[in-house]
Amino acid sequence: MAAECGSGNCDAWAARDPSGILSPYKFNRREVQSEDVSLRITHCGVCYADVIWTRNMFNDSIYPLVPGHEIAGVVTEVGADVKGFKVGDHVGVGVYVNSCQDCENCNSSLENHCSKCVVTYNSVDSDGTVTKGGYSSHILVHQRYCFKIPADYPLSKAAPLLCAGITVYTPMIRHNMNQPGKSLGVIGLGGLGHMAVKFGKAFGLKVTVFSTSESKREEAINLLGADNFVISSDENQMESLKSSLHFIIDTASGDHQFDPYLSLLKVGGVMVLLSFPSEIKVHPENLNLAARSLAGSVTGGTKDIQEMINFCAANNVYPDIEMIKIDYVNEALQRLINRDVRFRFVIDIENSFK
């Protein structure tokens, strides 16, 4: 292997440098505190954020770095003051594991917008330790950031809900995109985009998928049940849809034009950006003259997360996943870079650390 494995009470895979190559690693998790929930991780989704931080793309990576923030597992221990969780419960942990718990955002269940929010890996927690994520055998979190998963909902499918799912669900609820009969455009058909289609159909929307790749048509229509598929570079197709959509969810990575999509919105329509292009350029008339809105969003608060999990369980909404073992994770990350996944890798943690 590329590095020493180390010692500690938790098995994991970690990146040691900006090459992003992961290899076996051991470290110590803290002891269970009064409001902690300890869980044995069974599954962890693979998010593009794992590529970004293992490779130090934002120049802030802290090595050794254990990625993973789409975590599902089984409770093994709870602190003395924990309420609502017990040993054996199925639970999930998402993008963040701490916040100040006392600011306006925290008091409004918008912990993801707390200025002291601590993310699940590569972040300095309140005790000064660096957080390490779900590519590991177990994790401890304060009960506030732990979420119940119904016993009959597969943990392998639950894992991607904790990032891909909530990143889409929160803006859809915030902007009232759950109105049956209305129309939704989804730009991009990756991990986030496919969840936008699934939520859209579950909400009773008419869903149109936009892609630059004709190869996505069959996935969009036949696999995911979208109502329409449009090649976004085809001016005639785009022109035919002007002023036809109530909502657009933009999951496309990289830089792209916004005006062609904004012109597809009806009067008062809303387009929500979930990615991070280097810049946004729009003509004001595309917004002002039709009272359209361009909004942004990132993950969701604790109330939304539990609500989303419950909604998925009640409405049979399941991410489409490809299960892998931890020793395949380097190949999986490269395939993710190459956009070669349908639609989310999930690491079978419980059968990888034996």
From Swiss-Prot:
Gene3D superfamilies the UniProt entry points to: Medium-chain alcohol dehydrogenases, catalytic domain, NAD(P)-binding Rossmann-like Domain
Binding site for Zn(2+) 1: C47, H69, E70, C163
UniProt binding sites for NADP(+): 167, 188-193, 211-216, 251, 297-299
Protein name: Putative cinnamyl alcohol dehydrogenase 4
EC number: 1.1.1.195
Listed SMART domains: PKS_ER (SM00829)
Keywords: Lignin biosynthesis, Metal-binding, NADP, Oxidoreductase, Zinc
Family named by the database record: Belongs to the zinc-containing alcohol dehydrogenase family.
EC class name: oxidoreductase
Residue sites binding Zn(2+) 2 per the record: C100, C103, C106, C114
Catalytically driven reaction(s): (E)-cinnamyl alcohol + NADP(+) = (E)-cinnamaldehyde + NADPH + H(+); (E)-coniferol + NADP(+) = (E)-coniferaldehyde + NADPH + H(+); (E)-sinapyl alcohol + NADP(+) = (E)-sinapaldehyde + NADPH + H(+); (E)-4-coumaroyl alcohol + NADP(+) = (E)-4-coumaraldehyde + NADPH + H(+)
InterPro entries for this protein: ADH-like_C (IPR013149), ADH-like_N (IPR013154), ADH_Zn_CS (IPR002328), CAD-like (IPR047109), D-isomer_DH_CS1 (IPR029752), GroES-like_sf (IPR011032), NAD(P)-bd_dom_sf (IPR036291), PKS_ER (IPR020843)
Cofactor: Zn(2+)
Cofactor note: Binds 2 Zn(2+) ions per subunit.
Stated role: Involved in lignin biosynthesis. Catalyzes the final step specific for the production of lignin monomers. Catalyzes the NADPH-dependent reduction of coniferaldehyde, 5-hydroxyconiferaldehyde, sinapaldehyde, 4-coumaraldehyde and caffeyl aldehyde to their respective alcohols.
The keyword Zinc is assigned to this record: yes
One GO-annotated biological process of the protein: lignin biosynthetic process
GO molecular function: cinnamyl-alcohol dehydrogenase activity; coniferyl-alcohol dehydrogenase activity; oxidoreductase activity, acting on the CH-OH group of donors, NAD or NADP as acceptor; zinc ion binding
